[in-house]
Regions:
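N-terminal subdomain of nucleotide-sugar transferases
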Residues: 1-50, 209
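Aromatic "clamp/platform" in nucleotide-sugar-dependent glycosyltransferases that forms part
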Residues: 269
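Short, structured helix-loop element that forms part of the nucleotide-activated donor/catalytic region
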Residues: 215-242, 253
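Nucleotide-sugar donor phosphate/pyrophosphate-binding loop at the beta->alpha transition
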Residues: 71, 110, 120-140, 144, ...
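Short hydrophobic beta-strand element within catalytic cores of glycosyltransferases
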Residues: 282-290
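Membrane-proximal helix-turn-helix segments that form the acceptor-binding/catalytic region
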Residues: 30, 77-78, 102, 106, ...
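Conserved donor-binding/catalytic core segment of Leloir-type glycosyltransferases
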Residues: 7-9, 181-199, 205-211, 216-219
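An aromatic- and histidine-rich active-site surface loop
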Residues: 88-109, 113-115, 119-120
């Protein structure tokens, strides 16, 4: 039987191995793992020379600078012709989606788009760099799409309402991760995110100030769009004795720190589905969060959902002090995670969705 091929159109997996961790990179890496385990040949992009690592083929893709968009079409066409993939995958909103969708369709290749944020289908709120013309290209791209994977019910409903498009709600996948447990890494409360103002890191800082009896840890790198915010938060954090500002850490280091914590906090104004939740739940750790995708936290007792900064502080203290409540939530996390984030189950859902849509 001829080996099936998938092309992941992103440099995020390569960035992941370089230690530049972001949610898109983590998820695309685990999807690459999933496809290789199911005997697909997996290719993706890199700024480095072409190489193979963990059975993933990394293809050199140069940066064309200001001329890059004009070479998108040629580069996409060239790689599709050379690799003959059955599936092309891309994640997140952006102008590149349009040439990917057009060339894939014209080449008879199934193009699968994974959403990355709740704003992906909110007209005018998409997190797309550049001018309004980039948003218009994204809007046109959606009309070309046949296979769309969303992270939660809100994204599903927005896509249906705004564009009349159906989609599959699919859990993020989570592969095997080696965890190092060290007593000197132990912390009570951890916050993990790239520093952007929409993440509201100041909530976490203010919580640490009023709870000096607990250890707080912040992990994350600066955002290209908001580097000043990183420096602002770092300066505030250094003046708080019980708050450890670690800055950027690689994926394995972050996992070990989360695994040695008691609570994970999310203070974002909006998200798609934070991978940090999975880092916590894989270790039976509850979350306290301002986002609740598809009501997953409240429905399954996986943590506590808050709306205000005052409630955020109160619930941190409550969960750290109430051993019975903590144990109850931790048990629910263990049960829910073990049956909902298995890689093979989600792989089969994806493949069945693509095949059924093709046949319909």
């Amino acid at each position: 039987m001829k080996q099936q091929r998938v092309l992941i159109w992103s440099k995020s997996v390569s960035d992941f191995f370089d230690g530049n961790v972001c949610g898109i990179g983590v998820q695309l890496y685990f999807w690459a793992q999933t496809f290789t385990q199911n005997r697909w040949e997996v290719s993706t992009l890199t700024s480095h020379k072409s190489f193979i690592h963990e059975n993933i083929h990394f293809i050199h893709y140069r940066n064309w600078g200001k001329l890059e968009f004009f070479f998108f079409f040629l580069a996409i066409l060239w790689n599709i012709v050379q690799l003959h993939p059955q599936i092309v995958i891309h994640r997140g909103a952006g102008r590149i989606t349009l040439p990917l969708a057009i060339i894939s369709k014209c080449s008879g290749v199934k193009f699968v788009l994974f959403s990355a944020s709740d704003t992906d289908f909110e007209t005018g709120r998409e997190l797309i760099a550049g001018g309004s013309h980039n948003r218009r290209m994204w809007h046109k791209a959606i009309k070309w799409l046949q296979y769309i994977i969303v992270q939660n019910q809100y994204q599903h409903d927005m896509l249906k309402s705004k564009y009349g498009k159906e989609s599959l709600i699919l859990n993020n996948v989570w592969g095997h991760v080696n965890i190092t447990r060290k007593n000197n890494q132990a912390t009570d409360v951890v916050w993990v995110a790239n520093f952007r103002r929409l993440k509201r890191a100041e909530w976490f800082i203010n919580a640490a100030k009023v709870m000096p009896e607990y250890d707080f840890t912040m992990i994350g790198g600066a955002s290209k769009q908001d580097h000043g915010y990183y420096e602002e938060i770092k300066q505030q954090a250094t003046s708080i004795p019980n708050l450890h500002f670690l800055g950027k850490k690689d994926f394995n280091e972050t996992n070990s720190i989360v695994a040695n914590s008691r609570l994970l906090c999310c203070t974002s104004t909006f998200e798609g589905f934070p991978n940090t939740f999975l880092q916590a739940w894989a270790n039976n750790i509850p979350v306290i969060s301002t986002v609740n995708p598809s009501s997953i936290i409240s429905k399954n007792h996986l943590g506590i959902v808050v709306e205000t900064e005052e409630s955020f502080k109160l619930q941190i203290r409550k969960l750290l002090q109430d051993d019975r409540l903590y144990s109850s939530i931790s048990q629910c996390v263990n049960h829910y995670f073990s049956i909902n984030y298995e890689m093979t189950v989600n792989y089969n859902k994806l493949v069945n969705f693509v095949n059924e849509k093709q046949d319909s």
